[in-house]
């Protein structure tokens, strides 16, 4: 078996990626979230496949088909709620994974980091088109509002919106193509994940100390396979508790009302994992400015390798930047809260302050604190 594992063309790839992979001996539980994201992706593809067998992407029957899945299909309610709450677990793991990357300076592995940001964008796109599919009130109006943002692009904006809609409003053509996108995008994500891992294994993993760990590496199996299995066990437990006891806690009650183009919901808002970006979008009065700020709120992550001037790897021995980092996390939580609030005083003002703070921390405060800490080391 050992010979086969090391010599067989297919098994050799798996062996070098998951069995004999040299891994730093001191990586903590924060490094578990990569494997948890892989698990989430598998859960989403499998549950999504079974849902697609019963779903119809037609405006007249989409809402009814989701109700049919929940009522008449064997364990359809479970598959549907695992898929809906699985998306929330996916984004929780994604945010922690990115947060860990920033804290421990993983962005210095720039190829892996940039592919990761492309993955982030693709996952957000998948979640957005997926939210439209049940064809409830929030699905319809969310699709209308977000796709309408493209009309802010000069000259080609309105033409682009109609091209995406497949008509003059969000209708049957839009739903059909969104279903097609939602089906294909997870497989594109899977391809990007392989590229992400390819680049990661070129350089090797980062570790909490931020020091070179070539002198102290251990094989991935059995040490980290067992550790990852424990993480997966906790993830599945959390997901099952969410899906079985609180299936609708993260959803919107408006989505249990069939889509009606003649009746606008009081507060149009996306799923909770988009609220921070939605708050940044709303905090700018100008439409084009808001769209640019929305894009930059994620694209700014690509600036981390460029803005990094620190002589140390990660924040573990850098107390000033540590404080700034935790302020950034708190600021993102404030933005998430504001994104779910109505557009009125004082929420608009808090949103504007939090949006300015978000960009200021990343573009100004972090590079400045890097320089200060470099000078302290010289002393």
Curated annotation (Swiss-Prot):
Amino-acid positions noted as binding heme b b562 in the UniProt annotation, renumbered to this chain: 83, 182
The keyword Ribonucleoprotein is assigned to this record: no
Misc. remarks from the entry: Heme 1 (or BL or b562) is low-potential and absorbs at about 562 nm, and heme 2 (or BH or b566) is high-potential and absorbs at about 566 nm.
Membrane topology designation: Multi-pass membrane protein
UniProt keyword terms in alphabetical order: Electron transport, Heme, Iron, Membrane, Metal-binding, Mitochondrion, Mitochondrion inner membrane, Respiratory chain, Transmembrane, Transmembrane helix, Transport, Ubiquinone
Binding residue positions for a ubiquinone: 201
GO CC entries: mitochondrial inner membrane; respiratory chain complex III
Positions contributing to heme b b566 binding: 97, 196
InterPro entries in alphabetical order: Cyt_b/b6_C, Cyt_b/b6_C_sf, Cyt_b/b6_N, Cytb/b6-like_sf, Cytochrome_b, Cytochrome_b_C_euk/bac, Cytochrome_b_N_euk/bac, Di-haem_cyt_TM
Essential cofactor(s): heme b
Cofactor remark from the record: Binds 2 heme b groups non-covalently.
Function of the molecule: Component of the ubiquinol-cytochrome c reductase complex (complex III or cytochrome b-c1 complex) that is part of the mitochondrial respiratory chain. The b-c1 complex mediates electron transfer from ubiquinol to cytochrome c. Contributes to the generation of a proton gradient across the mitochondrial membrane that is then used for ATP synthesis.
Molecular function terms, GO-annotated: metal ion binding; ubiquinol-cytochrome-c reductase activity
Name recorded for this polypeptide: Cytochrome b
Assembly mode: The cytochrome bc1 complex contains 11 subunits: 3 respiratory subunits (MT-CYB, CYC1 and UQCRFS1), 2 core proteins (UQCRC1 and UQCRC2) and 6 low-molecular weight proteins (UQCRH/QCR6, UQCRB/QCR7, UQCRQ/QCR8, UQCR10/QCR9, UQCR11/QCR10 and a cleavage product of UQCRFS1). This cytochrome bc1 complex then forms a dimer.
Protein family according to the UniProt entry: Belongs to the cytochrome b family.
Top-rank taxon: Eukaryota
Protein's UniProt keywords contain Nucleotide-binding: no
CDD domains in UniProt: cytochrome_b_C, Cytochrome_b_N
